[in-house]
Amino acid sequence: LISDRCFAGADVCATSHTLSQGIRQSGTYDLILCGKQTTDGDTAQVGAETAEFLGIAHGANILEVLETGDTFVTVRMNLENKIQTQKMELPCLLTVDKDVNTPRLPSYKRRIGMDLGCIKVMGLDDLEDRDPGHYGLKGSPTQVERIFPPDKKTDKEIMEGTGRELAQAMAAVLRKHKFI
């Protein structure tokens, strides 16, 4: 668990830096699993950027883990237009959607036997990079001014036709609105 007041207000970059520092401090790893995105910023960028800070491969939108080995993991990932099967070398980081797995609740006996004292809490002083200017709001190259839902628009147009016809129609709309 990484927790310190100086981590507050972090954007994607500062959050990813914080996570990578905590992961490095935790020791060796083979596979890091991250959720696809958060409910606050909803950017789906923290996992990939954390992997970049760690210098390891990453796979996004993982639908299923097909095979694991000592040095690799084979996954199915959603690339929006197609589903791709990819064999990735370990260590790597994968971002998964909430539907990739349904976690089981521990049994009563197992809950009684859990050692909750084994959860280590790390703060700024426990990390390799102890510069508070690299974390939280101070370490964030971007700052959110405000978050709001977009206005609902009812003036949408659905176009049908061949690729050429659609391209011509789209160009006409862009010209009409002086985008081109």
Language model features: what each stretch is:
Residues 1-180:
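N-terminal glycine-rich FAD/FM-binding segment characteristic of electron-transfer flavoproteins
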